[in-house]
Amino acid sequence: MNTTPGTVGSDPVILATAGYDHTVRFWQAHSGICTRTVQHQDSQVNALEITPDRSMIAATGYQHIRMYDLNSNNPNPIISYDGVSKNIASVGFHEDGRWMYTGGEDCTARIWDLRSRNLQCQRIFQVNAPINCVCLHPNQAELIVGDQSGTSHIWDLKTDHNEQLIPEPEFSITSAHIDPDASYMAAVNSAGNCFVWNLTGGIGDEVTQLIPKTKIPAHTRYALQCRFSPDSTLLATCSADQTCKIWRTSNFSLMTELSIKSSNPGESSRGWMWGCAFSGDSQYIVTASSDNLARLWCVETGEIKREYGGHQKAVVCLAFNDSVLG
């Protein structure tokens, strides 16, 4: 793959943030310097994801998907799609980049063929409530779809069969994730709880089985995202309570609490901790929050290593890739 020197794609570490100010910003992770800003005209950005080959970044918003080139300084999206109604809340990619998946408020999860330059919707999975999150099993053959009725759907892409889990009815599933080892699935909800399942099967033609493992009363307010670390030893949960909490997957005990709460009693809330992403070595985590900042933290000590300031409104999503392609 060719990368142009001086572009985002030429940097071994790609960090992008976006939110309510209609921009996507790219940062030099170690220095905190903003290296590129892309205008995202039509709406806020709800979700960001970098393609596995690090050539493009997808940004989803209200009724559209935009894909920007990371290997040039072209300010305009190189792929645009406007044929989905309402907010698109979630986006991700098959590991070899053949297709992309999305989910949104129109109650559908979709699979898009990326091999043609115009986005073709290949498959649609319809549910009965707006979708908040979609995550791909490491086997690349099952999608987990979380909706606002509190249901997690496991959509088997090979058979089109689906199973449903309803850990806490009436509380919206806001985020779900499976660890890279495919040992656990976690889901968080609008009550602030985190549910963890053990995974078995999911290899070859075996269907994945989910066995309830634990329920963590992770947050006292709305939980917004959960993410396992690349080494599968940690689970992070982000919340409207201004914290991101890091849990050990060995026993799901709390290891570190990352907080943006002010130590000044007179200062009002700095807002929600919207999302997070681990570094490839699982030692650091980047968070996005309503106080217009992204932050880089040391996972073990909870120390803030870097702040990324420049957004004019809340930062609600980020994408982080520091893996070196072989």
From Swiss-Prot:
Alphabetic keyword roster: Acetylation, Cytoplasm, Isopeptide bond, Lysosome, Membrane, Phosphoprotein, Repeat, Ubl conjugation, WD repeat
GO annotations of cellular component type: cytoplasm; lysosomal membrane; serine/threonine protein kinase complex; TORC1 complex; TORC2 complex
Cross-link named Glycyl lysine isopeptide (Lys-Gly) (interchain with G-Cter in SUMO1), sites: 313
Post-translational modification: Phosphorylation at Thr-51 by CDK1 promotes ubiquitination by the SCF(FBXW7) complex, followed by degradation. Ubiquitination by the SCF(FBXW7) and SCF(FBXW11) complexes following phosphorylation at Thr-51 by CDK1, leads to its degradation by the proteasome. Ubiquitination at Lys-305 and Lys-313 by TRAF2 via 'Lys-63'-linked polyubiquitin chains inhibits formation of the mTORC2 complex, while promoting formation of the mTORC1 complex: ubiquitination disrupts the interaction between MLST8 and MAPKAP1/SIN1 to favor mTORC1 assembly. Deubiquitination at Lys-305 and Lys-313 by OTUD7B promotes MLST8 interaction with MAPKAP1/SIN1, facilitating mTORC2 assembly.
Conditions for induction: By insulin in adipocytes (at protein level).
Cross-link type Glycyl lysine isopeptide (Lys-Gly) (interchain with G-Cter in ubiquitin), residue numbers: 305, 313
Domain of life, per lineage: Eukaryota
Entry-annotated residues carrying Phosphothreonine: 51
Crosslink feature (Glycyl lysine isopeptide (Lys-Gly) (interchain with G-Cter in SUMO3)) location: 86, 215, 245, 261, 305
Residue ranges of WD repeats: 1-37, 40-80, 83-122, 126-165, 168-207, 218-257, 268-309
Keyword field contains Metal-binding: no
GO BP terms: positive regulation of actin filament polymerization; positive regulation of TOR signaling; regulation of actin cytoskeleton organization; TOR signaling; TORC1 signaling; TORC2 signaling
InterPro entries: G-protein_beta_WD-40_rep, MLST8, Quinoprotein_ADH-like_sf, WD40/YVTN_repeat-like_dom_sf, WD40_repeat_CS, WD40_rpt
Gene3D superfamilies to which the protein is assigned, alphabetical: YVTN repeat-like/Quinoprotein amine dehydrogenase
Principal localisation: membrane
Tissue: Expressed at highest levels in the brain and testis, followed by lung, heart, kidney, skeletal muscle, spleen and liver. Also expressed in epididymal, abdominal and brown fat, small intestine and pancreas.
Cellular localisation: Lysosome membrane; Cytoplasm
Pfam families: WD40 (PF00400)
Modified residues (N-acetylmethionine): 1
Gene Ontology terms, MF aspect: protein serine/threonine kinase activator activity; protein-macromolecule adaptor activity
Family: Belongs to the WD repeat LST8 family.
Function per UniProt: Subunit of both mTORC1 and mTORC2, which regulates cell growth and survival in response to nutrient and hormonal signals. mTORC1 is activated in response to growth factors or amino acids. In response to nutrients, mTORC1 is recruited to the lysosome membrane and promotes protein, lipid and nucleotide synthesis by phosphorylating several substrates, such as ribosomal protein S6 kinase (RPS6KB1 and RPS6KB2) and EIF4EBP1 (4E-BP1).
Binding partners and assembly: Part of the mechanistic target of rapamycin complex 1 (mTORC1) which contains MTOR, MLST8 and RPTOR. mTORC1 associates with AKT1S1/PRAS40, which inhibits its activity. mTORC1 binds to and is inhibited by FKBP12-rapamycin. Within mTORC1, interacts directly with MTOR and RPTOR. Component of the mechanistic target of rapamycin complex 2 (mTORC2), consisting in two heterotretramers composed of MTOR, MLST8, RICTOR and MAPKAP1/SIN1. Contrary to mTORC1, mTORC2 does not bind to and is not sensitive to FKBP12-rapamycin. mTORC1 and mTORC2 associate with DEPTOR, which regulates their activity.
Protein name: Target of rapamycin complex subunit LST8
Protein encoded by which gene: Mlst8
